[in-house]
């Protein structure tokens, strides 16, 4: 991108884009290529920084769920998925998968996937059952359910029925289905 080129040349730069998907990509490049951190080395204007801002984004323009979804996915560095064929990050049917995080399994070197689903509206335990079914169908190691609302007790109970992902490299068990609220992510809580 132009920002990466400007940074490489030691120039001052300003980046402007209209989608949270593109903004996330710029932040990833700055971090991966130059070890620059948001807030420490540059600032982003226009992204939610608190729960009220996240709610406003979810409700903006009649609730453009894709902008909210793309922003929420960026909080866990998930690659957006959806649309037709290979059009990743496009609007369209996603079969219950909004984003994917690929990771290399320690000890085996196998590439595994964590599937991510984002919800900005009302959530229920059936959403967790659906994601659990998607994990099984897609043979994914882990599932993350990101929600703007606090999960109900039934949702938390349903998530525990998914069991654990046993990491051969770290010799640890991680909850296979994890529920994270936007508030959790904004305050620094990360998936296990």
Descriptions of predicted regions:
Residues 177:
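Short, conserved active-site loop motifs that form the nucleotide-linked donor/cofactor pocket
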Residues 1-125, 132-141, 147-156, 160-164, ...:
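S-adenosyl-L-methionine-dependent nucleic acid methyltransferase catalytic domains
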């Amino acid at each position: 991108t132009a920002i990466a080129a400007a940074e490489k040349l030691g120039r001052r730069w300003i980046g402007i884009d209209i989608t949270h998907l593109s903004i996330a990509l710029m932040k990833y490049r700055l971090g991966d290529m130059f070890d620059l951190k948001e807030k420490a080395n540059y600032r982003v204007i226009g992204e939610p920084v608190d729960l009220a801002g996240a709610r406003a984004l979810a409700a903006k323009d009649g609730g453009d769920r894709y902008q909210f979804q793309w922003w929420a996915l960026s909080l866990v560095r998930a690659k957006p998925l959806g649309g037709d064929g290979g059009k990743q990050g496009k609007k369209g049917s996603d079969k219950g998968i909004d984003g994917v995080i690929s990771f290399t399994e320690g000890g085996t070197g196998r590439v595994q996937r964590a599937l991510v689903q984002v919800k900005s509206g009302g959530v229920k335990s059936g959403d967790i059952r659906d994601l659990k079914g998607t994990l099984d169908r897609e043979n994914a190691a882990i599932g993350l359910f990101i929600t703007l609302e606090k999960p109900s007790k039934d949702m938390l109970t349903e998530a525990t029925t998914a069991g654990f992902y046993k990491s051969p490299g770290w010799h640890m068990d991680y909850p296979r289905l994890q529920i994270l609220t936007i508030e959790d992510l904004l305050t620094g809580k990360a998936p296990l």
